[in-house]
Amino acid sequence: MILVVIAASGAYFFHDYWEHRFDELIAQQARIYRIDEKLVWSLIYEETYFRSGAIGDVGEVGLMQVTPLVAREWAKVTGLSEFERQSNEDVVGLLSDPKRNIQIGCWYYERLRERYRGRPAETAMTLAAYNAGPSRVEEWTKDTDAAELTEAEFIERIGIASTRAYVSSILTRYRETAAVK
């Protein structure tokens, strides 16, 4: 019986450690880019479940599954030659660093969010663009006034089932964690 209690306690504490070991980095970068840290946490949970070395099906890397193209855009925008060099010579290494990955992922999220700022479905549209690309969001809203769509109406219009599930899952987790405080 004691071994069961010890094992359960260990599993609980490991689980808590695993899910929250990047909280400080997430909070730091979320503040810089004015994104709710619980949203960034929820996005990382969905993307990789906090596996910093994760590689996606089409070459996305790290916690926030950032593409090499996005990393190179970020490096160019920073104007720092060291980041440009690293993004060209070892982009996987750059994106496998949790701090850089979260920084670049938050930068990209904010860049996408600029397109949808102030809309009722701002967060859902930004998440959909993060997952499937902004051109898909435009496609899903082309025959309506996108500035007036509610979040639920937009999610219903998402034409890729996996993206619809991705957006819904992140929003649900985000709202659950935001309610806990």
Predicted regions and their residues:
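Pocket-lining segment of extracytoplasmic ligand-binding domains
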Residues: 88, 92-98, 109, 113-114
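Alpha-helical scaffolds flanking conserved acidic
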Residues: 36-42, 120-128
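Export/targeting segments at the very N-terminus of extracytoplasmic proteins
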Residues: 5-52, 57, 75, 99-102, ...
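Catalytic and substrate-binding regions of cell-wall glycan-acting enzymes that process beta-1,4-linked
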Residues: 124-181
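Substrate-binding/active-site groove segments that recognize
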Residues: 58-86, 104-107, 149
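Conserved catalytic or metal-liganding residues and their short signature motifs at active sites
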Residues: 55, 60, 131
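Sec-exported extracytoplasmic/periplasmic mature domains
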Residues: 31, 45-49, 68-79, 106-118, ...
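Amphipathic, non-transmembrane alpha-helical secondary structure
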Residues: 99, 103-106, 110, 124, ...
